[in-house]
Amino acid sequence: MAGSGSWDGSQSDNSSQFEPGIDNIYEAFICPLTKQVMHNPVTLENGQTFEREAIEKWFQECRENGQPLSCPITSKELSITDLSPSIALRNTIEEWRARNDALKLDIARQSLYLGNAETNILLALKNVREICRNIRKIRQRVCNPQLVRLITDMLKSSSHEVRCKALQTLQVVVEGDEESKAIVAEGDTVRTIVKFLSQEPSKGREAAVSVLFELSKSEALCEKIGSIHGAIILLVGLTSSKSENVSTVEKADKTLTNLERSEENVRQMAINGRLQPLLAKLLEGSPETKVSMAFYLGVLALNNDVKVIVAQTVGSSLIDLMRTRDMSQREAALGALNNISSFEGSAKLLINTGILPPLIKDLFYVGPNQLPIRLKEVSATILANIVNIGYDFDKVPVGPHHQTLVSEEIVENLLQLTSNTGPEIQGKLLAVLVGLTSCPNSVINVVSAIRNSAAIISLVQFVEIHENDDLRLASIKLLHNISPHMSEELANALRSTVGQLGSLVSIISENTPTITEEQAAAAGLLAELPERDLVLTMRLLREGAFEKIISKIVGIRQGEIRGIRFERTFLEGLVSILARITFALTKETDATLFCCEKNLPSLFLDLLQSNSQDNIQRASATALENLSLESKNLTKIPELPPPTYCVSIFSCLSKPPVVLGICKIHQGICSVRESFCLVEGQAVDKLVDLLDHENDKVVGPALAALSTLLEDGLDVVQGVRLIDEADGITPILNVLLENRTENLRIRAVWMVERILRIEEIAREVGEEQNVTAALVDAFQNADFRTRQIAEKALRHIDKIPNFSGIFTNIG
């Protein structure tokens, strides 16, 4: 008898002689070279028998060593090296092996129950694996339903080792055996195996993946595996794991590849981040498969990076589907394109791939095979997504005659389509126009088309829509975008209709949990309307708009109204709207009374200190200028008592009566609330601080507000003294010297001339050559009136003699 040995990594057949109930191995069955039971015995000319593979290897080694071919047993040289198959011996061995396998399987069946000792179970599982491997070698198979079910029962063991070996055994049993796979697929066994992907140690996970890989080779089982909750996400997770061994990762990947035969599995993979199979089917599948995949791509949640990948991979194919005459293909393609067009990166790729021409054609085409309205709405949505990325659309042709998206003809068609469709598509078309008007390069084209088509009235009417929030929002955003270019037309439209102005006010004043985009857009729209439009201002006053706006401003300033995203733009709009009432003070008593009642000067003084909010500071300074200009009309001049007889006789010797509380500037009794006095409101310091602002649009209004203290009819000397006390002289001179804009220079020259009327200031400033140079430049190059004022300023510092005036003096 030959001893036991190792063969092919598993326990050899000769070990069976030590197991109870197993036939002993006959010595004739053993190959002298391998010491293993032979599978393909062959005989030499001298009658010695060997395993074919082993003796062929022996002969090869003899040749490589330059030795004559000899018998490994007798060491004698062979004259003939032909190998004769030992058919009878092979049949005998196979019969012996089949008999022993049957006995081993019977013992295994008896050992495979959960109450048995772990060692017995493990031995039984090992024997089953050996038998199955041997059967594979002789290209036979065995299907023992009872045994397969007993092995699956071992998956319920409390022992990790038993469960792992049971999985390894199942993998060997089902390999290439469809019947065994079908038995494993019964009941919840596959679900249990899937569970092991996350709950077992590393070896157990590898064994579970190996079983699933074998099962997934059966097309009939692909859907069953994929239908188990968590199966695909766990497999996808394993493929990207950095901690799993390479074998587990590779088997998981191969399993998923097999599962791709089911479209539902492909969808599940896409949901869980493995999108490539879906894209591959969309590119290479049948027309029906392409439609199915495109439909699913349209509803799939995608992050922005994935949208770019999708656009790169299948963007062209989707556009081709969109161009077909098949309505289901077009619908599926539009849905997918809608999904991936909402990110700037993917939208640019789609533009470069040529999406715009067919998209525009689908929107405007009327005739056979035209898109139904519901799909035109999707087309409009895609177009809205694309135009909101801020692309140079004037360089992308979309029509047969090289029209672009911002060509007047195309924009007018969009406007016409907006008027002739339902609310859903109207909202999308308006969103397209919002995108186009958000770009400085294209807004002028849209404004021109709106003017030429007289569409402003119909656009304003959308403001009153209450049944469709998206439509109303899009219309307000569009009107806001065009308002800087069409403020007069918008004001006329709002004046000539009933309800729209009130609707905008209602939106602004609505009590919402946070500030909405619609509120910010509505406020921005009203803020752009002509500020000197008295009719519009008084309508706002009568409708209670200003009171509501004050409430909103105070609420935001006190932190009672929040909305980080839109708070700044909303507040800017509110302050600008409120400031317009100060333009009505000279003509409307009601406006003056409202400003007094609500103490608007104090509110604007508070807003003046809104650091880093230029538009709010600009509007507040402008409002304070208007309020201050009205102070001289509101100041109460005290009545002096009539002089006594003696005083009237000796008036040259008497002193004028002293009245306490007289304003130095307005020579009357002032207050910030009732007469809008900047001095009483302690506004001078705050306005002077803004003169150093980097934004010219803030400096100008601040300078204008300060200049109201130097107006004719006021005590200019006292006004200059107040500005000097606030250290405002130098900043004013700096505005003159910097010469940022012509308007700032005109205002600065006017103020400097008044300041230089103070003799000691004139002496000091006269020594500053740069100031003199700036005044000389204004004297030579500014407009006529400013040149006159600059001449007077130069006289104050003795740079022009009094007898050398060349202009008519002005008061």
UniProtKB/Swiss-Prot annotation:
Pathway: Protein modification; protein ubiquitination. Its EC number is 2.3.2.27. It catalyses: S-ubiquitinyl-[E2 ubiquitin-conjugating enzyme]-L-cysteine + [acceptor protein]-L-lysine = [E2 ubiquitin-conjugating enzyme]-L-cysteine + N(6)-ubiquitinyl-[acceptor protein]-L-lysine. Keywords: Repeat, Transferase, Ubl conjugation pathway. GO terms for biological process: protein ubiquitination. ARM repeats lie at residues 136-175, 178-217, 220-261, 263-302, 303-342, 344-388, 399-438, 444-484, 489-528. It is an enzyme of class 2 (transferase). Residues 24-103 form the U-box domain. GO terms for cellular component: mitochondrion; plasma membrane. GO terms for molecular function: ubiquitin-protein transferase activity. PROSITE patterns: ARM_REPEAT (PS50176), U_BOX (PS51698). Signal peptide: none annotated. Gene3D superfamilies: Leucine-rich Repeat Variant, Zinc/RING finger domain, C3HC4 (zinc finger). It comes from the Eukaryota. Functions as an E3 ubiquitin ligase. This is U-box domain-containing protein 43.
